[in-house]
């Protein structure tokens, strides 16, 4: 019934016009699972390797034919005849066959696409939705929740061609009673933000994740125009809508000088000074979550940041932890941050992703499920968020179908589950 009879890989195009890997897993029962690997722009140095061809004459070197060949060759040969329901075994076969610590032979993009396609095929064979299958794989059958969205409505940093240093300014519709209502609040704020920006003569062009990408006078101004938009939409900042930021500070950290160089504002900071700068912003605005507030290697600075802000703010490690249980375990032991961002392709398989979520939750850390700046119509992260009851999701703004695909899947899931999947809002955020 759930025996694998064929594994197929192909090169498709992602939301930034770059190739990525799509995989299909076919079962003897006729069921097929299909999934695509996302791709990041601001990446942690310790992420699993995304295998690119490097042939400058083709897709400027970004082709993924080598990764696709791994899917159609050694991965397919190893998996045919195996039971798709045994997700951990399937993932381990691919990891062992690759034989490297960072999936450098086949590419995390190849292994992940097959891993997720396998989960989808197994769910279909069990006649259950993907989120329900994920809950079973997670050891929490029937336990679901709808995630609080973090909507990236102003893009800066590596996600936009503008002068804003901080990469993401997000809103969270904490006053909503349901996920669907939260999306409505987000959409209304998003449209009002367009009006606010236009009234000030700013561009309303969007960045990689669907948020606006204007040139602003400062990072504080980004928060100010969002505050105006929230009010214009008829909501109360701090009550109906809270704020979150992804600094992606590794992108503006000068390793040689050991300083944070915010070129957009013409300011430089030491680790400690930047922590106090963030504290000041959090005092001025109802910011409840800060991601990658320092460089991924600045563990001393992160420890200070956690001591300074960790009791009142969610401090999320993305480049810091890269969805890796070994690195997360070190962070937990040292008391660094209090939350982890979960990105499938940072680690490269569903099984390892579930292990990172479990480790975080067991330690009292929150887990925020996340997209990447390079996405496809694949909406698996929506099912992951619900199936692990993670509580929070980052999947961009209220524009670009590669972002909205995930929100629409969440709407469908909420409709199907009803009261079985509560929307807990701000209660999901660490420190709130």
Curated annotation (Swiss-Prot):
- What's its top-level EC category? lyase
Kindly give the HAMAP family that the UniProt entry links to this protein. Answer: Enolase (MF_00318)
Q: What is this protein called?
A: Enolase
Q: Where does (2R)-2-phosphoglycerate bind?
A: 167, 343, 372-373, 394
Instruction: Write out the catalytic residues in the record.
Output: 209, 343
Q: Tell me which family the UniProt entry assigns to this protein.
A: Belongs to the enolase family.
NCBIfam families reported in the protein's UniProt record: eno
The organism's place on the tree of life at top rank: Bacteria
What PANTHER family does the entry give? ENOLASE
Q: Could you say which residues bind Mg(2+) here?
A: 246, 291, 318
List cofactor names only: Mg(2+)
Quaternary structure?
A: Component of the RNA degradosome, a multiprotein complex involved in RNA processing and mRNA degradation.
- This protein's pathway: Carbohydrate degradation; glycolysis; pyruvate from D-glyceraldehyde 3-phosphate: step 4/5
Q: What is the lineage of its organism?
A: Bacteria, Pseudomonadati, Pseudomonadota, Gammaproteobacteria, Vibrionales
The protein's organism comes out as: Aliivibrio fischeri (strain ATCC 700601 / ES114)
């Amino acid at each position: 019934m759930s025996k694998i009879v064929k594994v197929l890989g192909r090169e498709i195009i992602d939301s930034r016009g770059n190739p990525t890997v799509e995989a299909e897993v076919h079962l003897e029962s006729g069921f097929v699972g299909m999934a695509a690997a996302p791709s990041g722009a601001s990446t942690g140095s310790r992420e699993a390797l995304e295998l690119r061809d490097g042939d400058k004459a083709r897709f400027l070197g970004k082709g993924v034919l080598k990764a696709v060949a791994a899917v159609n060759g050694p991965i397919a040969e190893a998996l045919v005849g195996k039971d798709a329901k045994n997700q951990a075994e399937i993932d381990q076969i691919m990891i062992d066959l690759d034989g490297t610590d960072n999936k450098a032979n086949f590419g995390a993009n190849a292994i992940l696409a097959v891993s997720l396609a396998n989960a989808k095929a197994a769910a279909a064979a069990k006649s259950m939705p993907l989120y329900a299958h994920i809950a079973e794989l997670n050891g929490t059958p029937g336990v679901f929740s709808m995630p609080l969205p973090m909507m990236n409505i102003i893009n800066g940093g590596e996600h936009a061609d503008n002068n804003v240093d901080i990469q993401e300014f997000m809103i969270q519709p904490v006053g909503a009673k349901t996920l669907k209502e939260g999306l409505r609040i987000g959409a209304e704020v998003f449209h009002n933000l367009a009006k606010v920006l236009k009234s000030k003569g700013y561009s309303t062009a969007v960045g990689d994740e669907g948020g606006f990408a204007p040139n602003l006078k400062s990072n504080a101004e980004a928060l100010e125009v969002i505050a105006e938009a929230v009010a214009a939409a008829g909501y109360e900042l701090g009550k109906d809508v809270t704020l979150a930021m992804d600094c992606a500070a590794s992108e503006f950290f000068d390793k040689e000088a050991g300083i944070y160089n915010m070129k957009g504002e013409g300011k430089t900071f030491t680790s400690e000074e930047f922590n106090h700068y963030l504290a000041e912003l959090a005092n001025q605005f109802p910011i409840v979550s800060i991601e990658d507030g320092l460089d991924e290697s600045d563990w001393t600075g992160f420890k200070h940041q956690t001591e300074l802000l960790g009791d009142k703010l969610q401090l999320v490690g993305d480049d810091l932890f890269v969805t890796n249980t070994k690195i997360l375990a070190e962070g937990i032991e040292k008391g660094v941050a209090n939350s982890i961002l979960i990105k499938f392709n940072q680690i490269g398989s569903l099984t390892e992703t579930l292990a990172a979520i479990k480790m975080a939750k067991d330690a009292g850390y929150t887990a925020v499920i996340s997209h990447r700046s390079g996405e496809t119509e694949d909406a698996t992260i929506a099912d992951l968020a619900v199936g692990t009851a993670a509580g929070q999701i980052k999947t961009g703004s209220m524009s670009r179908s590669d972002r909205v695909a995930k929100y629409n899947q969440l709407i469908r899931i909420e409709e199907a589950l009803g009261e079985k999947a509560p929307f807990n809002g701000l209660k999901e955020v660490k420190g709130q």
